[in-house]
Amino acid sequence: MKQKTIKQDVSLSGTGLHTGQKGTLTFHPAEANHGIKFRRIDIEGCPVVEAKVENVVDTSRGTTIAQNGVRVYTVEHILASLRGADVDNVLIDLDCEEPPIQDGSARYMLEALKSAGIVEQDAEREYLRVKNTVTYFHPKIGCEIIITPADDFRMEVSVDYKSQVLKPQTAVLKRMSDFEREIAPCRTFVFFQELEMLLKHNLIKGGDLSTAIVFVEDAVQAGELQRVAKLFNMESVGIHQGGILNNTTLHFENEPARHKLLDLIGDMALLGKPILGHVKAFKPGHLANTEFVKLIIENLE
C-alpha cells in the first residue's frame, strides 16, 4: 500500500480545552516519509515538533509533546483523526500551544481532512510489527494493554470506573475503515466531581459544557450546580436522564469506552508509523498509552 497525504490545505479554528487559547490549526500536504509534524507559527523561527513518543512530556488529561522547549498540548485527537483518515504525511501549523477541542471528539478534524482530499504518494507504506505478544501493566491503576502479532489491525478497549452512572463497558474497532462512523464522533468525558478540581489546576480553561460529556455520580445540591454554571458562564445547568449534565445525549450507549479507544489510537500514532496487530486494553489512559508505545518500540521486528 502507498503512503498518503492530503491534496490541499485545510484549517480549523476554535479554543483549546486546557489552555483556553483561541487559535487555528492548518493541515498542509507533506512529502513521502515526512510523517506527522506540528509547526508553531506563533513563535519566531516557526519551530517544529515531531509527533513521536520520545517527545511526550506530559500526560495530564491529555498528551503533550515538546521539542527544544516548544510544546503542543492535547495532540491525541488530531493524531487519531489522521489515522482515521489514513494519512501518513502532513505538516500541521498551529498559531498557539493547543489545537481547538471542537466538540471533544475527532469528528470535525476527520471531516476537514477528508474535505481536503486524500491522495496516494509514490512511496510504499511501512507497517510496524511486534515480534511477540507485548503486555503493559500498571498495578496502581489496574491498567493492562496487550498487542498480539497479526496481519491486520483491530482494537478492543474496556473501562470500569466503579460508577453507578458510567457502567463497565467495552468498545471494539474491527477495522480502521469503521473509525469514521464508529469512533470519530465519540466525545471526551469527565465526572462532575472532577470539574472544580480541574478548573482549580488550570486544566480546562477552554472547556464548556458542549465540549465534554459530564457524568454526575453522586447527589448534587442546587448550589453546586449553580457554582459550576457560573464557572462555565452559563445561567443554569441541570442533571438529566442517565446521570448526564446539561441535557447532553450519548451518541452511543458505550460512548466513553469508544472515546478511550479513540485516545489510544491517537497515542499509538506516536509510534510514527501504522502498526499491525490486535490490541486489547483495560482502563487505558494517556500515561499508560504512551508507556505502552515505548514498550512496543522495544519489541519491534
Features from the language model and the residues they span:
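Short acidic-hydrophobic catalytic motif
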Residues: M1-E301
